[in-house]
Amino acid sequence: DDIVKKFQLGYSTSANDALVKEAQKKGYKKEFLIKTGLCYEKEDGSLRDRFWGRVIFPWLNISGKVLGFGGRVLDSRTKGVSQKYINSPESEIYNKRKELYGIFQAKSSIVKNDCVYMVEGYTDVIAMHQCGLENVVANSGTALSEEQIRLLHRFTSNITLLYDGDEAGIKASMRGIDMLLAEGMNIKVLLLPDGDDPDSFARKHNATAFQQYIKDHEEDFIRFKANLLLKESQNDPIK
């Protein structure tokens, strides 16, 4: 599948030491496996794979080099699992504040369209690519950092925050706004219909329909915030 190759998606088997055994067989030292975050040490001193039993999403830097990984349990296993997603720990080569998921695959499209869509998760990015919208990156649920904004600003000054239409999505759209403004970015906000995230919405619509929805519903940040404050005050001018 093209999208699997494009994002270098993988799967770590349900054997919780498969990578450990294969890596050590090939001569990789215990310290290296721990330091890179691929494995962790148990109390008894044995090693366990960090991402066992998960779909793997590699984090690529702007040059396409792998810096770290995200791992997600499959839907059938999410019940009772405390962490649906796990990520590589910070290391000498992976600093989450400086990276954006999908930036390598998106950079040429961002320049071409002079705009970037910011979403929350890995699957949001991938679903939008499948829908034909490629100028999209994710900050994976963390607050935007100055480093991430400056990275985006190398390619465009225009950003649309694209999030779920529920309360959590509204809060997410407000995070990092001040920093975006301080870095001179032009901001628009688009909240999807309640109950949809970019992943589910992209699965229901083709690229043309999705782009038309964005065009019809994205709002300038000032207008978006004013409307939000009006709703919160229930149109009471005193509030």
Residue map of PLM features:
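Amphipathic alpha-helical transducer elements in NTP-driven molecular machines
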Residues: 100, 146-149, 153, 169-177, ...
